[in-house]
Every structure is written in structure tokens, then in C-alpha cells.
Amino acid sequence: MRMSPLAVVIGSLLILATIVFVVVLLPYVHTNQTTPSEIFRNRSAEEAVGRKLYIANGCVYCHSQSIRTIDWGLGAERIAQAGDYLADHPILLGSQRTGPDLSPAGGEHPDDWHVAHFTNPRYTRPLSLMPAFRFLGDKKMGYLIRHVQGLGMKAADRRMARQVEWKAKAIAAYEAGPDANVAWLNAQIPQGWRDVPNPYLTSEAGLARGHKIYQDFCLGCHGPVGDGMGPAQPFLNPPPLNFTILKNREISGGILYYQIMNGITGTAMPYFKRELEAEKIWEVGNYVAVNFINDSDADSEPKGIDAAYEP
């Protein structure tokens, strides 16, 4: 059988039509049947402008917006659902992460943390590879922050309401003076955590590890000498805590551990329980206690059974 030009054209058109049907029409029909998820809501006008800036400035190249079953990081308690993305055109799922996934990022930090972060990411995350976005100016940066704070939709709205509530309380405590501020911060910690014994020696090696952790995670806000005057400080309200005022204020290792682990919602202090395992939290707490507070309860009783590597 000879292949005529007409047969080639018709065959090619049939193949093209099949591809269009499978790749375009079938997914379109399927997505039209998708129902909104329990967290879905439409974007505000400011969030929509911020999303355009997010795309235009290449944020999607490094940040995905899809939590998968294999993920163990931020937001992994809830796996992404098709109904989360009904208003996304285009969808910004992403497949490779240089930075963290941002789909649940809304409300994880207060707005002022994001101002410092976008001005220079090293101010809040000293090891960050992210470029600075101070060139956007205050107005565009504000739109970008609104977009990020909306990621997570209704769940993000709940987190943002919590940030706003606790920020007002944290600012009031700070403005009441150092004594009232420290007392308020300590009052938010369960008694059991305040009294938990610090099992780790302040050894030379442990303090060196704590110093490295402090440089990698804490220096941008609390500063190199722990006085709260890191490069992020001018952008933050309330400002980072000055550790040097904590001497003789009954700051136990358990208090430091709890605050590092859980953070202080409403302030720029994030939680680190997903990034630092228990020993690293103890060691950076010991570093702060020894070098900035000059008061440590390390290696206190009851210690239980020492770990195998301990002297």
C-alpha cells in the first residue's frame, strides 16, 4: 500500500488530535470536577498582585508549593490535595527545591520577619542562598509578603490571626520594660519545662558545637554577642531578646530549650523543633547560657543513664 500525501496529512492530524485530547481535554474535564479542599479560598487582590511578583522574580525556581507523602519538613502533617489549587493559573507545584516548600508558609512568621528576610535573607537565615529583594521597594515587597502569608489559605488565615494576637501581647510586654518582659516570657512556659534538668555537660566540644549552631541559626537576630542587635533587629517589633539581661533572672536550661524548640509566636523567634534535634537545642542553649547569661545549670541532677559517648 502506497502512502499518499493525503494519508500522511490525515494520519498526522489524527495523532495530533489524540495528543490534544489526552494532554489537554481529559485533564480539563477532570479538573473541572475537582471540588475545593477544606482550606481553599480565593485570593485577595493584594495576594494576586504578590503572586505575579513571585512568578516574575523567579521564586518558583527554588520553592515548590506541594507537600508530598515522602516529605517530613514544614507542613508535612497535611498532604497537598487537588482542591488546594483551583484558583492557580498557572499551578506552581514545582519539582525541585533549593529553598523550602512554601505551600503552608502563611502565618509561620509575622510580617516583620518577612520584611527582614526579603531585605536580606541572611538577616534571618544566616546560611540562606536566597538573593536579596530589597530592590522591590516597600510597596511591592508588601504585596509579595501578602502572597506568602496567604499560602495555606484558610489554614494560613488561622495562623496569621494567632500571630497578630500574640504580637500585640509580646509588644505590650516588651514596652513594659525588661523585668516585665522576661517575666511574661517565662510565664508562657509550662512549669514542667522550666524545671526539666539539663543533662549535657558544658564541655569544650559541646560549646563549640553550640557556637556553630548559634552562628548558623541565631546570629542574624540576636547578634554575635547575644545583645539582640543582629542585622535583622531594625526591622523587628518587638526586637530580638538581649540575652545579656537574663543574668540572675532564673533562666534555666529547660526555659531556653522550650523557647528554642517552640519559638515565640507573634515575634520573629521561630520554632526550631523541625530543624534541630534535641542535643543541638541543648548545646546552643548551653552556649547562650555560658557566654551571654553567665549562668548555666548544665549537667544537673537527676541525669539518669549517661549516653554511651559521654565521658
Where are these regions (language model features)?
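Electrostatic cytochrome c docking/interface patches
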Residues: 31-55, 67-72, 173-215, 301-311
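Conserved catalytic-core motifs of eukaryotic protein kinase domains, centered on the activation segment
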Residues: 231-233
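Glycine-rich, acidic and aromatic/proline-enriched surface loops and short helix-turn segments
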Residues: 19-27, 120-123, 224-227, 262
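The canonical Cys-X-X-Cys-His
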Residues: 50, 56-65, 114, 130, ...
